[in-house]
Amino acid sequence: MAASMCDVFSFCVGVAGRARVSVEVRFVSSAKGKGLFATQLIRKGETIFVERPLVAAQFLWNALYRYRACDHCLRALEKAEENAQRLTGKPGQVLPHPELCTVRKDLHQNCPHCQVMYCSAECRLAATEQYHQVLCPGPSQDDPLHPLNKLQEAWRSIHYPPETASIMLMARMVATVKQAKDKDRWIRLFSQFCNKTANEEEEIVHKLLGDKFKGQLELLRRLFTEALYEEAVSQWFTPDGFRSLFALVGTNGQGIGTSSLSQWVHACDTLELKPQDREQLDAFIDQLYKDIEAATGEFLNCEGSGLFVLQSCCNHSCVPNAETSFPENNFLLHVTALEDIKPGEEICISYLDCCQRERSRHSRHKILRENYLFVCSCPKCLAEADEPNVTSEEEEEEEEEEEGEPEDAELGDEMTDV
């Protein structure tokens, strides 16, 4: 049951009409599936579309470690200065230009029943209307025996940082269908994401859960069923259906990163200052990030993932002509042209980060094959086809380090810094 073209564009915001006239979804091949193509000239730097996800959820360990985000849109809730104080471990850390912080605490609201926090009344209402009535634990928020808490604890015991997925993304899918008046529409939307064979699904689940994935998957399925069973999507609760749902989230979940501190830094970059003042501010920010790295390491953002209908139609290229980002400090995904895109040209993003894209063809293929189960045939890979299938010594060392990390360390789309 495929989603209609109308459904594909229905989660675009702001420039939704623009997206409908500037791009179209086409079938490419049995290997690639769908693709997104320009129908008119798109200029470099132009926003091609802005899209909100069908569902999104913060990663569970990220939330447990006090990365405070709106429970609906993932907007960072800490003031930039509070964020800096927590990440540096310095309660007295003060930021200059506090007026540049965009966080509005006066607008924050919590659920009156379970106390989860939202950035605004609009987000609280949107969550309540879409899925939160089903998922709200009420006064049992901290009860370890509540079915949802048992499910989340089981997930945390299996999927450690760096996180790439969340069982709560799947929970919000079910809860959305449960609450929906038009259940068939939501089932159509979720079913349009790419499907894998049984063997491919097992590879994805293995990547997420590790060597004991079969037993762990069955434990999660049992807890998931106990907490959320819904007759309208009963197939999602069977062993095969749950594995498919898991694989759907593992391959289609787009990483989301938000940070009030990053927003403040970007605002500082736009200030018109005297050269000496600019030098002082830049030096302050450089030192701030050094202090954060020493205290916190690489985990700077509120992190989660979401399912985006139109963005999921964008195929990968190692030389992308578009990129994804989250400049609004929430779950609204912007796809922006990196170069002029001609009518009829496919719009491609990269599933690899900047460093990975600079590695050898062999290394790029290894990452893509392990995480997305395809072999890239973009212009860069075709041009390098005659290169030997070897990695440099530096890349081999990096791969050895990665093999020492949790097996899920690289799964998922690039989390774009804000």
UniProtKB/Swiss-Prot annotation:
It comes from the Eukaryota. Keywords: Cytoplasm, Metal-binding, Methyltransferase, S-adenosyl-L-methionine, Transferase, Ubl conjugation, Zinc, Zinc-finger. GO terms for biological process: methylation; negative regulation of gene expression, epigenetic; positive regulation of cytoplasmic translational elongation; regulation of stem cell differentiation; regulation of stem cell division; transposable element silencing by heterochromatin formation. A zinc finger (MYND-type) spans 98-136. Disulfide bonds: none annotated. It is found in: Cytoplasm. One of its GO terms (cellular component) is cytoplasm. PROSITE patterns: SET. Residues 385-418 are annotated as: Disordered. Its EC number is 2.1.1.-, 2.1.1.372, 2.1.1.359. Ubiquitinated and degradaed by the proteasome in response to mild hypothermia (32 degrees Celsius), relieving repression of the SP1 gene. Belongs to the class V-like SAM-binding methyltransferase superfamily. This is Protein-lysine N-trimethyltransferase SMYD5. It comes from Homo sapiens. The lineage of its organism: Eukaryota, Metazoa, Chordata, Craniata, Vertebrata. The gene is SMYD5.
